[in-house]
Amino acid sequence: MENTEMKKIIDRQRAFFHTGTTLDVSFRIAALKRLQYMIRRHEKEIEAALLLDLKKSSFESYMCETGLVLDEIHYMLRHIRSFAKEQDVRTPLAQFCSRSYRKPSPYGVTLIVSPWNYPILLTLDPLIDAIAAGNKVILKPSAYSPACSDLLAKLIHRYFPAKYLTVITGGRSENTALLQQHFDYIFFTGSKTVGREVMRQASSHLTPVTLELGGKSPCLVDESADLALAARRIVFGKFLNCGQTCVAPDYVYCDEKRKEALICELKRQITKQFGSEPLKNPSYGKIINQKHFERIRRLLNPEKVIFGGNVNPDTLQIAPTLLDHVTFEDAIMQEEIFGPLLPVITYRTLDEAITRINSMECPLALYLFSKKKENIEKVTAKCQFGGGCVNDTIIHLATPYMGFGGCGESGMGSYHGKDGFETFSHTKSIVDKKTWIDLPVRYQPYRPVKKWLLKKVLG
């Protein structure tokens, strides 16, 4: 698509925005219900597209994509009217006879750039929040998940007018061309490298951004943890979608006294959840493409594999794999793994672990398995991270009642539920001053008595 054509789409959306149509909350509710209907009506097509792109099972497609999207819509439909209401706030004495209030307003024309790993969820979740806030949206799904991207384009264009919502497919050239346009807000989910470029391009128009990136999310297991339960939940969170989850536990960081017992439990759980031959499990997915398959395989040091390690280049599959004797200097610890490889590293003291985690880039997530309240308080207070779980993994992502987002190198801003509505809204602070009285204190000429009165109401 040419730059001029993109600009025409944006101009049409901006013109539609200025009609004020989407300021009506009833219009937004109708749009959310239409999106809800679209997803339910075409659930089987969505499932088939996810199977093609990522070999996702029917169960996983609903649990991790379609179901979560429908849950977000359901939540937003219940709360949108209260979110969109003007909110009265207190007025200082110096401004008496006034009404002070905060008014949520849509930004206008927004761009949502989504990734390939959860191509339905991570495209439609921010779209729901943007619609609820009253924006127009251009969606740019990933070229790496073509079946899902093409399906989204077909469905969105069938159910919504392009002046309101539209999908632009394509690869790097389309991304580059889009980022050169003037948007009122940009929401990006993806790699840190591209995130920096998004922010750089947005700065030329002073466009605000939300960046949902990634990082090496640690999974701490202390000496008090229930190892059987920890292993079960770590294996679930790590190997879901073949480890291609932005909040997957990147590595296990456990108390050195519990390592051997934990490894035994991890091995047992991998076999229990995926079978003795995971690559033959019909519900086990695949790596998205050859490029990422080779990247992950380069991180797989055979000398450090203690479980798994099998690969199938023909199907782009890598079995759930445990690695031991890994150091923080190893290649696998220099980048986000984003695949089914799980290093197990030990610490001697919890303070040592906290210091090490804080010496690294801020992770998108952190997980702690512990029964000790003091350890839970210490880790959640002292470690820098976007969000996380205590005694579980990744489930903090799956709730509309809390915002989800990163910090530092793992991103900025948040979304889901009310946080998502606020992300796509500019809140105007307004004072409505009454006209029946106008005290002269603030006006020149200034006199000592005016300053005396001023000191009574200020400070």
Put a short name on every predicted segment.
Residues M1-Y101:
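N-terminal Rossmann-like NAD(P)+-binding subdomain of aldehyde/semialdehyde dehydrogenases
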Residues M6, V25, E43, L227, ...:
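Residues at or immediately preceding the N-termini of alpha-helices
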Residues F17, T21, Q36-I39, E43, ...:
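Structural signal for hydrophobic packing residues in well-ordered secondary-structure cores
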Residues L23-D24, L220, T271, I318-G459:
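Conserved C-terminal structural/oligomerization subdomain of aldehyde/semialdehyde dehydrogenase
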Residues R28, I73, G134, L165, ...:
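Residue-level signal for inorganic ion chemistry
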Residues L93-L229:
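Rossmann-like NAD(P) dinucleotide-binding subdomain of oxidoreductase/dehydrogenase enzymes
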Residues T193-T327, V390, K450-W452, L458:
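ALDH superfamily catalytic-core signature
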